[in-house]
Amino acid sequence: MHFKKLGIFSVALSGLLLAGCNNQDDSSATIEEKLNYTINGIEPGSGTMGLANNTLQDYENLNNWNLTESSTAGMLGELDKAYKNEEPIIFTGWNPHWMFAKYDLKYLEDPKKSLGEIENINTIVRKGFKEDLPNAYTIVDRFYWEPEDMETVMTDAQDSNFEDAANKWVEENSDTIAEWTAGVEKGNGEKISIISTPWDTEDASSHVIAAILEQHGFDTEITPVDPAIMFQAISTGNGDISLAPWLPITHESFYEKHKDDFIDLGENLKGARLGFVVPAYMDIDSIEDLAPKK
């Protein structure tokens, strides 16, 4: 298996006294003030950030709040720092993800459903893939797993890497793999391009399907790109398969733009979710509980 990574994207005493007078990070500051009216986001090209920006517009109390662009690693770093100090933080989160196993977290209620509800993750393939590689197509079409399976791979990858974690999952679930490959003739080194996105959820699914296909005689390459490029690659035939589309909300705009140019094989996972997430120690339960910026 090959893995291709693309590039995307002194102080005077009087000053100390003044800083002390203006510092709101004390027991009298509200949660919103301690947060600096800011929600921690991830990569700007993700569907999650588009929904998060819409949410700030949908809720009048959030109209003047800030949504910071970062990376998933950067967001997780901020979460870890805040959690260790029991400080408030609001961030864009989703599951399946190992963060929910490592930290005690909760979703803020979203009465307007601006961030969607339960999501599915679908499998799409380029037109002609079934005719060109019918055996691989059958395996890819049969691939379906549960959120707990994905989280297992994601968690194991924290102590190793996704290739090793995927191989471990495949080995431990040989009966399931046997069902997916039953009656399917082995490949002869045919190359299969897997287009993924740069997040742990898709790292997990892409590496697992790659491990299964490799085990069955195919040669795979995984390329992580932004969601817009992922849909474009499959639609133009520059990639063979993707297990990355989140539907019906997160990637809806990309899906609608290209839906006539690829084949949708349906869900490979049901029960995914995204939203605004906080540590369980924070005394807040809903987006509507947040005070507007003064």
Short names for language-model regions:
Residues 22-24:
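Bacterial signal peptide processing site
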Residues 67-78, 199-200, 221-233:
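Short helix-initiation/N-cap motifs at beta->coil->alpha
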Residues 204-218, 222-286:
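Short, glycine-/small- and polar/acidic-enriched structural segments
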Residues 29, 33-41, 140, 188-201, ...:
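Short, well-ordered beta-strand elements
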Residues 16-20:
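C-terminal motif of bacterial Sec signal peptides marking the signal peptidase cleavage site
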Residues 86, 99-112, 252-265:
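Ligand-binding "clamshell"
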Residues 26-40, 126-130, 137-138, 144-147, ...:
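A conserved helix-loop-strand patch within extracytoplasmic ligand-binding domains
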Residues 73, 100-141, 267-275:
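Periplasmic-binding protein-like
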